[in-house]
Amino acid sequence: MHCSLNGDWSMQLNSTEISDLIKQRIESFNVVSEARNEGTIVSVSDGIIRIHGLADVMQGEMIELPGGRYALALNLERDSVGAVVMGPYADLKEGMKVTGTGRILEVPVGPELLGRVVNTLGEPIDGKGPIEAKLTSPVEVIAPGVIDRQSVDQPVQTGYKSVDSMIPIGRGQRELIIGDRQTGKTAMAIDAIINQKNSGIFSIYVAIGQKASTIANVVRKLEEHGALKNTIVVVASASESAALQYLAPYAGCAMGEYFRDRGEDALIVYDDLSKQAVAYRQISLLLKRPPGREAFPGDVFYLHSRLLERAARVNAEYVERFTNGEVKGKTGSLTALPIIETQAGDVSAFVPTNVISITDGQIFLQTELFNAGVRPAVDPGISVSRVGGSAQTKIIKKLSGGIRTALAAYRELAAFAQFSSDLDEATKRQLNHGQKVTELMKQKQYAPMSVFDQALTIFAAERGYLSDIELSKVLDFEAALLSYARGQYAELAAEIDKTGAYNDEIEAQLKKLTDDFKATQTW
């Protein structure tokens, strides 16, 4: 044994080779160290988890759970973190390990989302394959400051005669649509989106806490009318967790801000913020936050104000700064149409009063009008637009001055006329005119009207062309007049649709058109 070892010199290594080999091994040794901010779930109840041992967590941070899910840190307490699970939570158990990600929730943004239906996290749910979005954006962003804003002076045409004439909406405005259930709130918002299909305005429709069947119907209607290709639909249906319903409006807003910040115009509909407030109330109560009025938490005003302040018209300097000089000389806007559902017409409840005070006006839809067949059921008495007047199309503004007054006077006189049988001629004329205008403001769903169509209709009403027409024939007269005008005065129609201008020459042409029609046509 001893001899054989001594005799085998090939086995021997000198000391320098050994030290070189050790150095090589040390140099090539790769240590992968990962610092993880880890904690343990100590309780799970109703989608709320309490986590112990998770240090350095931000408010609103994403916390990674087993199974690739996430929770959102909302309560940062001395010895635990209260988080709300985004998604199913039935299989979560006490003792499970969770990890802080160090990231705030972000959603994909960009033109790749147009024409798609996504959930709150921006994941497609329409079965049309993955979305190859190049950018993401945080869901919570501070709204542009006063210096970055520009006054609202460009119109958003909803296609509704009653809205565009009496309660005009401008790009960058927040206009609340408020009313009881089944008064046509969603119908009005969807028609406004359909009317943008050729206006260059992108649309985002955020459905919060609605039935999946209702949302599917909305998507189908948008597709049928060719508006889906310019629209992003964000869905947090009634079956989703409260966390996703609470976050959906912010996610949709981030998608809309992508267009605003790049000098484009976008319109966002929140349908509806009452359900978002209820979801937030549920989360807050489960997190043991102290309840206030109607059991809502103290910060429910801030919940909506920080969302709606992000709808704005931003100036060209802001857009240029944001795009690093790529887009010059263009202002951007995000117009918001939040929807609030009232209970038995009570606009003085907590959430409705909050949102009324945040927004730049409201369109109030009344059950009585809706049931009487006045659709859209806009109440001109308490509906206002605080900033839209300066954004109204010139021709509509010039022609529609007397519409609101006529309707308000008619409502007042109609109530008075019930008690009196012998009315003087002037009162009868006013009542007759008010009835005709009310009839004329009726409009079918999914039939938004162009600027020319609205202008001609209002012109006919204001210049007394309806005075000798039976009430039941008013809408037939309107349809025949518009059909005649599109055929015989196509150039005038195209000019008004394009420019919205109004002068003596255009007025003379409108008068000639209406006179010719009444003299030669039947309806």
Curated annotation (Swiss-Prot):
It is found in: Cell inner membrane. InterPro entries: ATP_synth_asu-like_sf (IPR023366), ATP_synth_asu_C (IPR000793), ATP_synth_asu_C_sf (IPR038376), ATP_synth_F1_a_nt-bd_dom (IPR033732), ATP_synth_F1_asu (IPR005294), ATPase_a/bsu_AS (IPR020003), ATPase_F1/V1/A1_a/bsu_N (IPR004100), ATPase_F1/V1/A1_a/bsu_N_sf (IPR036121). Keywords: ATP synthesis, ATP-binding, Cell inner membrane, Cell membrane, CF(1), Hydrogen ion transport, Ion transport, Membrane, Nucleotide-binding, Translocase, Transport. Gene3D superfamilies: 2.40.30.20, ATP synthase alpha/beta chain, C-terminal domain, P-loop containing nucleotide triphosphate hydrolases. The record marks S383 as: Required for activity. CDD domains: ATP-synt_F1_alpha_C, ATP-synt_F1_alpha_N, F1-ATPase_alpha_CD. Its main location: membrane. It is an enzyme of class 7 (translocase). One of its GO terms (cellular component) is plasma membrane. GO terms for molecular function: ADP binding; ATP binding; proton-transporting ATP synthase activity, rotational mechanism. Signal peptide: none annotated. Its EC number is 7.1.2.2. ATP binds at G179, D180, R181, Q182, T183, G184, K185, T186. It is a peripheral membrane protein. It comes from the Bacteria. The keyword Methyltransferase does not apply. It catalyses: ATP + H2O + 4 H(+)(in) = ADP + phosphate + 5 H(+)(out). Belongs to the ATPase alpha/beta chains family. F-type ATPases have 2 components, CF(1) - the catalytic core - and CF(0) - the membrane proton channel. CF(1) has five subunits: alpha(3), beta(3), gamma(1), delta(1), epsilon(1). CF(0) has three main subunits: a(1), b(2) and c(9-12). The alpha and beta chains form an alternating ring which encloses part of the gamma chain. CF(1) is attached to CF(0) by a central stalk formed by the gamma and epsilon chains, while a peripheral stalk is formed by the delta and b chains. Produces ATP from ADP in the presence of a proton gradient across the membrane. The alpha chain is a regulatory subunit. This is ATP synthase subunit alpha. It comes from Vibrio vulnificus (strain YJ016). The lineage of its organism: Bacteria, Pseudomonadati, Pseudomonadota, Gammaproteobacteria, Vibrionales.
